[in-house]
Regions:
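Fold-independent oxyanion-binding glycine-rich loops
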Residues: 25, 162, 195
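A general structural motif
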Residues: 170-175, 236
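Short acidic, Gly/Ser-rich segments with clustered Asp/Glu that frequently serve as metal-coordination loops
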Residues: 199, 222-224
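Glycine-rich phosphate-binding "P-loop"
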Residues: 156-171
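Alpha/beta catalytic barrel-like cores
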Residues: 14-113, 120-136, 140-151, 156, ...
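Domain-core and long-helix interface of multi-subunit machines
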Residues: 169, 192-198
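Short, positively charged low-complexity motifs
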Residues: 1-12
């Protein structure tokens, strides 16, 4: 039996028939492990070797998921090492075109829905323009990768709103202003998530109404950073569903449970 690990959270679509998936990696499956390197070892040859390995690993993951009836999967941002950094000057989109074509065919054939989640430093509401510019470059990388793998806009990039910087309302306004300036190819894939510290479900729903962006509901984040306390989770999901249009596909949610032995927000290794 293969144990699924990653961010130890389930990724769900809600509808007449629920689909379930997971984030990033498999345990006990050596041919699915991603590889990377440190910056000083990131020669062009080494990066090409790593990208080739990682794309093969992704193909193996997709095959495994299909065999297990798993229809959703979050792809690791590290699949292209230093993908949004000038350290990586490899023209990987062209060099690996045939591999991406094969992966796209797999995703279509398996009826798989994939996603990505740019990291904690991808912050478009920062008051620092350099931070915002780096975030935009990172979003461009994630979007380019998804565009090579998936044609339609149902395959999403999940983003947190970002920091508060001493004035939450102004930070929310900056997020909306920066979002409006993003390229349409990025906006068609972006969805925002309630986080466990700063931005509640109520906050992201307010933003979603203003800029017409889908919301993904994270149940554990909602428990740690609650809002709309007069509503149960089913009622919260009904509000979230209203942010999704047909072009976005079926509504998604993130489901995980607290590890009782670790800090608040640490995911349990399984879901009951």
């Amino acid at each position: 039996m293969t144990r699924i690990v990653g961010h130890t959270r389930a990724i769900l679509t809600i509808g007449d028939k629920m689909k379930i998936g997971y984030a990033c990696t498999l345990a006990l499956q050596d041919d699915t492990k991603m590889r990377s390197c440190i910056a000083k070892n990131a020669s062009e040859l080494r990066l090409i070797e790593l990208i080739d390995h990682n794309l093969t690993a992704l193909s193996n993951i997709l095959t495994y998921n299909h065999q297990q009836g798993i229809k959703m999967f979050r792809i690791s941002s590290d699949i292209i090492p230093f993908g949004s950094s000038p350290i990586n000057s490899v023209d990987w989109q062209t060099l690996f075109q045939s591999a991406f074509t094969f992966l796209q065919e797999q995703i279509k054939r398996y009826d798989m829905r994939v996603s990505m989640h740019p990291g904690q430093y991808t912050i478009i509401n920062s008051p620092n323009p350099e931070v915002v510019q780096r975030a935009i470059v990172d979003l461009q990388y994630h979007c380019a990768l998804l565009d090579l793998l998936c044609e339609d806009a149902t395959h999403k990039m999940v983003l947190h709103v970002g920091g508060v910087y001493g004035d939450k309302q102004e930070a929310m306004k900056r997020f909306m202003a920066e979002y409006r300036e993003l390229d349409e190819t990025i906006k068609r894939r972006l969805i925002i998530e309630n986080d466990d510290r700063y931005y509640t479900l109520e906050d992201v729903l307010w933003i979603a109404e203003k800029i017409q962006i889908p919301v993904v509901f994270d149940n554990l984040h909602h428990k740690l950073n609650p809002s709309l306390t007069n509503l149960n989770e089913k009622q919260c999901l009904a509000l979230v569903k209203q942010t999704w249009k047909s072009v976005d596909g079926r509504m998604k949610m993130h489901y995980s449970e607290q590890d009782p032995l670790k800090r608040a927000g640490a995911h349990a290794s399984s879901i009951e």
